[in-house]
Amino acid sequence: MSNWKPNIPYNDLPPLPPKQDIESKTILKRCIAARASLARLKQAAELIPNQAMLINTLPVMEARASSEIENIVTTTDKLFQSLQMDTERQDPATKEALQYRTALFAGYESLTSRPLCTQTAIMVCNAIKHPYEMAIRKTGGTALKGGNSGNVVYTPPEGEETIRGKLANWERFIHESGDLDPLIIMAAAHYQFEAIHPFTDGNGRTGRILNSLLLIEKGLLDLPILYLSRYIIENRADYYRLLLGVTERQDWESWIIYILDGVADTADWTVSKIDAIRRLFEQTRQHIRTHAQGIYTHELVNLLFEQPYTRIANLEAAGIAKRQTASKYLKELSDIGVLQEIVIGRDKLFIHPRLMELLRGEGNSFTSF
């Protein structure tokens, strides 16, 4: 029985692995389904001819949803617009959500030089909270309150030495549990990181980035394209209820099944979204080739799908055309209905409305040319 009390720092947080069975028949059955869905996602990503299409779009959607879980609310449109604008013109919520994307990429790059570890978590949290410097908590006073009641529902461990010790155990569990499926490791490690709550802010977002990095490190994905925060947003009450269920009753099975179902649901959703983007890419390519043959190149079509908003400078940077010619190309693409010109402040942007429609919505249909 847990000796946990909501108002007392949980310095007795049990280490990993749990004493409870986390490989029950039910868990393993759900794990097989989630692994199959992830394998389909990995294959779908490999079949996209230009990986930038995924790496520039799906992490932005994950950044928006993961930030929304923490009540940092912006829109998909604003995020993609802001990628093409000066940072000083971004509103605070959009800027913080984009920092999540920056942190995700920084974590992804770090896997080439060191395994997932406490230092990775510190680096990721610092990128999320920039310009504030984040370090392992040294003082007490951190407590999590219920959204409606305002009552304290959980007080994480206190003391830097205690927290670092629990993170060291978390790290060992990730790397020394080879007999466990990586998805079960991810689910258990995610609970533990949330329970340790090592920083004064940014813990939830850091933990969700670490999920993606763990899947890449274990070889289940090649790119950080799992949009798991979408599932958590849709099932947010269950997310917090099941986290607390592990703390109160050591109910690991319900929590792990929730995460496995989320991985399967999200991977299947993303495969369908990738398929829709591929169909739109082919339609766009054919439409430009038919109605603007003089400017058609494969490089130009690729660029239009790397982000839903394009500007003249993007064509210049890609070596497709000089400024005056690039302006002519974008005007012609607007004339044939591929792009739509908009002006935001001093910025002239060209939106691919059909691509934006796909990225903004749940559905996978789009208006044909």
UniProtKB/Swiss-Prot annotation:
SUPFAM superfamilies: Fic-like. Transmembrane segments: none annotated. PROSITE patterns: FIDO. The lineage of its organism: Bacteria, Pseudomonadati, Pseudomonadota, Betaproteobacteria, Neisseriales. It comes from the Bacteria. Present in outer membrane vesicle formulations which are used as vaccines in human. It comes from Neisseria meningitidis serogroup B (strain ATCC BAA-335 / MC58). Residues 111-261 form the Fido domain. This is Uncharacterized protein NMB0459. Signal peptide: none annotated. PANTHER family: FIDO DOMAIN-CONTAINING PROTEIN DDB_G0283145, PROTEIN ADENYLYLTRANSFERASE SOFIC.
